[in-house]
């Protein structure tokens, strides 16, 4: 009896093992049969999640990015053309023509300055002011500006003119393949206004020619172009912020309008302290909501 009692669990155990093995084989077989379906379901689930994530963030901003690249290329193409006219006048010794072409040529650059700043040394090579870099490395527009307005001569500027044009053409070549995304655009818009606040509205940028308002206007235009490309996405997420930014761009441009002079702008020296104060106030009023655009867009 004891023997039978002792052997019964062994039989049960053996039977259990056998049944378990069969069960495992069936489960494995079922798993193998279900794997393609499960994989398909998992893939569909992942794709659905990705689509939902993209919908949650609003957009991948491809249209806006493509639009900004096209805008940048258009501006840089014209920048190269106008810079060549300017440098030709410098090399020809035509002081008056060189002075008249200086500020208009720079506007094309100032509108897309975030692009140049993203390309290493190109921005300081083209746009560094006296004191921004070592004296031996100073070149670009402001080096020539000093000679034209302070020294009243084009002498000794031929090499600087050639190098400036070469740098402009290099900028054009590099923009074709550079990475541009919504983050660069949003950051760039804010940086353009920071540029205005730190140097243009103070009259420090064009310390010899006093053509700061050209740069001021171009920076604002560049920032507005970025906003225009992203405003539909922004409005979908925060209608009030979108309207606030639009209104404050309008207010700033209205404040700047009286200083237009034909196709250009009056000398910065003609601005009164009250004029500078109003421009600064309108600039600050725009900068604050514009700085929130990136967070709302999720970039």
Locate the predicted segments by residue:
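Bacterial lipoprotein signal-peptidase II cleavage site
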Residues: 8, 18-49
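Mature extracytoplasmic or organellar-lumen-exposed domains after removal of signal/transit peptides
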Residues: 46-299
